[in-house]
Amino acid sequence: MVQNILFDLDETLLDFKRSESRALSNMLRHIGVEPTEKVISRYSEINKSRWKLLEQGLLTRQQVKESRYEILFAELGVDYSAAEATAYYEDQLSQKGFMFPDTIKLLETLHGRYRMYIVSNGGSNVQSGRLADSGIGKYFEDIFISEDAGAEKPSREFFDYCFGRRPEIKADETVIIGDSLTSDI
């Protein structure tokens, strides 16, 4: 019998694409680049390819974060630190947690009937800020972030970390709800 629900955060409960678009546009304007559709589209291609390399174990999280800007800035002829761009982007990203239209309705329906937890591959500071802005943190008993766990979802090590921190979570009584078969389940 299901007792626990593990929810992915980005693109499951919160609209990451909307938050990302806002943060990216703000960062690009900050460094003097107009966030045109062409620039945003190219960033998206680079970003997706970098995250796939992370999933394959070929890049670290930090390498993903910085290399996407190194590549984009090189293509645009922009002389700006990828590390500084990453820091600015993450600060902007942490400020807004846009919810999907039925997020609150879903959480209110399930709250009290199940123990609910968040599991996320996002960064700790970013996710903490987005949760605070959205106000949905109150529905969850705990939040498990891959950065804190030292392992990415859906690795065994990540879920061992979750189960180790909360012994009441039993694998055979738990479901996970996410948007990606490769990075959630």
Give residue spans per PLM region.
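N-terminal helical cap/lid subdomain that shapes the substrate entry/recognition surface
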Residues: 2-101
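Conserved Rossmann-like nucleotide-cofactor binding loop
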Residues: 12, 19, 124-125, 182
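Short glycine/proline-centered loop/turn elements that form peptide/ligand docking sites
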Residues: 13, 105-109, 181-184
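Glycine-rich, phosphate-binding/catalytic loops in enzymes
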Residues: 21-25, 134-136, 162
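Short acidic capping loops at alpha-helix termini that bridge into adjacent secondary structure
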Residues: 35, 81, 138-142, 170-174
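Substrate-recognition element of Asp-dependent hydrolases with the DxDx(T/V) motif
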Residues: 84-85, 92-96, 103-134, 140-146, ...
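Conserved Lys-Pro-Asp/Glu-containing loop-to-beta segment of HAD-superfamily phosphomonoesterases
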Residues: 152-185
